[in-house]
Structure formats: C-alpha cells, structure tokens
C-alpha cells in the first residue's frame, strides 16, 4: 500500500 505511510506518519506526529 502507498497510503499506509501517510496514516502511520500522521499517527506518529500526533503521538509525538
């Protein structure tokens, strides 16, 4: 998938 990185990145940004 190519949209997973975006979702993961968003979650990581929210966590950080």
Swiss-Prot record:
GO terms for cellular component: extracellular region; membrane; other organism cell membrane. It is found in: Secreted; Target cell membrane. The modification Lysine amide is found at residue 16. Keywords: Amidation, Antibiotic, Antimicrobial, Membrane, Secreted, Target cell membrane, Target membrane. One of its GO terms (biological process) is defense response to Gram-positive bacterium. Expressed by the venom gland. It comes from the Eukaryota. Belongs to the non-disulfide-bridged peptide (NDBP) superfamily. Short antimicrobial peptide (group 4) family. Probably forms pores in target membranes. Has antibacterial activity against Gram-positive bacteria S.aureus NBRC 13276 (MIC=25-50 uM) and B.subtilis NBRC 3009 (MIC=1.3-2.5 uM) but not against Gram-negative bacterium E.coli NBRC 3972. This is Peptide Im-6.
């Amino acid at each position: 998938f190519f949209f997973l990185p975006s979702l993961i990145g968003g979650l990581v940004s929210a966590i950080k």
